[in-house]
Amino acid sequence: MAEKKFTVLDLLDLDLPGHDALELKCIAGRRGLPRTITVPDINRPGLAISGFFDAFAFQRVQLFGRGETAYLKKLHDENKTDTLQQLFNYKIPCCIFSSSREPTEDFSRLAEEACCPILSTPLDTTD
């Protein structure tokens, strides 16, 4: 019997009423919800969004906290989306924004184009 793959949609389905520990919601990239999560770890992509991809753990769920979100805003304000385009050239399972933070318009647009799900949670990165 084939082993069932765990997808981003499965991650969202874990948040059923009464089991809503992560309080996740999909805010962009819905077409990518069938993407498989093959590595059960997270990655903080600070180095990647600054342009360093040599050791980028793209197979992991990418977790964006306060620092990463502030840097995304700086990239947006300076109209620099090259590194974001590079980020989405990798087949990332999904990105999660903590503390109800939201990605920039550029980030959301590129995620949509790459079919990369963007999830949001009100929880802090340390929760």
What function would you assign to each model-found segment?
Residues 65-67, 99-100, 122:
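Fold-independent oxyanion-binding glycine-rich loops
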Residues 102-109:
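Short, glycine/polar-rich helix-capping loops at beta-to-alpha or helix-loop-helix junctions
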Residues 90, 105, 120-122:
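Internal alpha/beta core interface subdomains
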Residues 114-127:
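Long, charge-dense
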Residues 88-93, 112-116:
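Short, surface-exposed connector motifs at secondary-structure boundaries
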Residues 2-88:
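Gly/Thr-rich phosphate-binding loop signature of adenosyl cofactor/nucleotide-binding cores
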Residues 93-99:
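Short internal beta-strands
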